[in-house]
Amino acid sequence: PTNISVEEGNNTFIIDGGWVVNKKTNTLFGAVNVKQNKTRTVIHDLPNYIDHIGMYAFSYCIDLTEITIPKCVVSIGESSFDQCEKLETIALPSGITSIGVGAFGECTSLKHIDFGTDVSYIGTAAFFACINLATPSFYKTKIEIIHGNSFWGCNQFRTVEFPSTLNRVEDQAFAMCKNLNTLVFNSDQLIIENGAFTYCKNLRRLVFTKGKPISIGTTMFNEDGKTPDGKCFITYLYDTNGE
């Protein structure tokens, strides 16, 4: 559809300043004028009371470069900014707890994002192929699982330090991060699945500050289960005691 309308007396949805909002959950679903929204470059007029950005709310807004997220927002929905190719930076409110599946997938111009301290969930492929994204500050979050393909192809990542809450890194979570060099893990209950860092050709150093992981997949780096791709051997694999 090119336009969305809400009938008078609707008990669930309202239109507020050109935006469609579920008034029961304070979820923003998108713009009334869908076609016009796809061509906007800057958005600073979202309702200031919304708590959630809904699924696909801004997906394929290929000209969007900048958006202000209201301070009370706590979750970014599935594919909400999928393929916003020109979006360069986004400031997430400090209270954000959840970033949905594919939320920023293929935002190829995205350079910076700050998770804040309350994020505990990042969905599968949330930042898939964000090839210009600088390494976010994972360390201060409450993330427990890095889901598959979450950061596939994030080529600007170099050193990543994970929070003590992390207990699992899933298959392909950081695959194709070609410049990733160092990983620092701060958990004593860690499982790294097969292929979690496949094709990370420059990965050289792993640090486990709380001792050895519970499990490391046999093909963590490469399909042969022996060495990282390109035969770039890991030069350090130790805990804080050097063991």
PLM regions with names:
Residues 30, 54-57, 77-80, 100-105, ...:
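Consensus positions within tandem repeat domains that build extended binding/scaffold surfaces
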Residues 1-19, 23-52, 62-75, 85-98, ...:
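Structural signature of tandem-repeat unit edges
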